[in-house]
Amino acid sequence: MIFDTLNRLGQYRGICAGLDKLIDFTLAHDLNALPAGRNEIDGDNAWMNANVAPLVPETDLYERHLEHLDLQIPLDAGEIITVRPVEELEWDFEGETGFTHGPAGTALHMVPGTFAVFFPGDAHNCGISEAGQTSCRKLVGKAKL
């Protein structure tokens, strides 16, 4: 997992080709101007979703991926994402994505100007409200490893 500020995103090039594609796309575009929905980068190998995600006061639903990483970027509001090692939880898979319920993990306080990358070994629990907000416009990039 990576949690950092967008001004340092370029420093993470070289970890894997898929992440490099997401980094290049992110740095080359006005993120607030991206249209809602799927923004193509490299077909099913890399893309960026722009959406408004609902936020709730608390949730225990974790997800993980088998072959893709996530790059998450909040654009207009804060969001808490909690993380745990995948080995600490039991998983049910629906194709590429696994879901499970689990106890609270380490909290990342995502605010505009920050980003997080979640690799297949990172269970992440998204959509927790920061300061009572009910939604967050965000980008979620996906890249195949």
Feature names for model-found ranges:
Residues P35-P57, Y62-E63, E67-L75:
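A short glycine-rich, His/Asp/Glu-containing loop-to-beta-strand
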Residues N51-H65, F93-G105, D122-A123:
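Short acidic (Asp/Glu) patches
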Residues L71, F115-V117, Q133-L145:
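A short hydrophobic beta-strand segment most commonly corresponding to one strand
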Residues M1-D44:
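Surface/interface-facing alpha-helical segments and adjacent flexible terminal/loop regions used
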Residues E67-L69, I73-I81, P85-E88, E94-H101:
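Glycine- and acidic-residue-biased ligand/ion/polar-headgroup-sensing regions
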Residues E58-H65, Q72, T82-R84, L108, ...:
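Short histidine-centered beta-strand/loop micro-motifs
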Residues H109-S129:
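Conserved metal-binding segment of the jelly-roll/cupin
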